[in-house]
Amino acid sequence: MAVITAAMVGELRALTDAPMMECKKALTEADGDPVKAEEILRVKLGSKASKAATRVTAEGVVAAYVSGNVGALIEVNCETDFVTKNDDFLGFANTLVKLVAEKNPADVAALSALPLEGKTVEETRAALIGRIGENMSIRRFVRFETTGKLASYLHGTRIGVMVDFEGADEQVGKDVAMHIAAMKPVALSSDNVPADLIAKERSVAELKAAESNKPADIVAKMIEGSVQKYLKEVSLLNQSFVKNDKQTVEQMLKEAKSTVKSFTMFVVGEGIEKKQDDFAAEVAAQVAAAKQA
């Protein structure tokens, strides 16, 4: 049986907002596995127990660039929030996103090899690290080239959205991009939701329904109802439009004679686990070192 520490409980609580005792029970049941513990909390406490998708820990910025029918999004990471406000770091990210749009590199390695003001991008990055004194990396980027229109939205520098759409009204694209940043859909329509996410949601629904002790036919309906509710919540076209919750995004687009072809959203640090410093251990080590000196 794994030893459940206060730090483990605190970390799970930070991810889920669940009560401390529930977090400890879930970790005990999961034998210390935080991923399993989070799933257990979802079954016990409902979907509000999982906020991992919107709670990110790594630092950095998202930059966007649109020129006519070509555009790009990029995420550049650093170690601390302080550096995200540095003009040189921000300038580097904005230069890179324009370079992605103009040169269409295949991947981060190809982007890093491109020339930039007499150096390569990689050499420029290394020089910036030396100047600022903090590690930084190019995490990911996406490039758009469309026969329609592009709209981008940046929520500060932490969330970036690019939308490929068709329609006469430019504002529609901007509104959809802002909606995506706020509501964070995972797919354009329910048909596009990744199978692994549906399977995970169905598994949670099955466990919750099994605890109801209802007849099998009722349980089956409960499971299907939960899955359909999830699909509606995470697919863009089915979501209630953030600027008018009386209609869905699909209804708004139809009314505006517009269509969304695709979209991409980057959230800084999404999926990256940031090292947590153990300050108590650090102080203890410093005290021990001082005694030996």
Swiss-Prot record:
Alphabetical list of InterPro entries matching this protein: EF-Ts_dimer_sf, Transl_elong_EFTs/EF1B, Transl_elong_EFTs/EF1B_dimer, Transl_elong_Ts_CS, UBA-like_sf
One Gene Ontology term, aspect cellular component: cytoplasm
SUPFAM superfamilies, A to Z: Elongation factor Ts (EF-Ts), dimerisation domain, UBA-like
Record PROSITE patterns: EF_TS_2 (PS01127)
Gene3D superfamilies: 1.10.286.20, DNA helicase RuvA subunit, C-terminal domain, Elongation factor Ts, dimerisation domain
Region of interest (Involved in Mg(2+) ion dislocation from EF-Tu), residue spans: 80-83
Reported function: Associates with the EF-Tu.GDP complex and induces the exchange of GDP to GTP. It remains bound to the aminoacyl-tRNA.EF-Tu.GTP complex up to the GTP hydrolysis stage on the ribosome.
Entry similarity comment: Belongs to the EF-Ts family.
Protein name per Swiss-Prot or TrEMBL: Elongation factor Ts
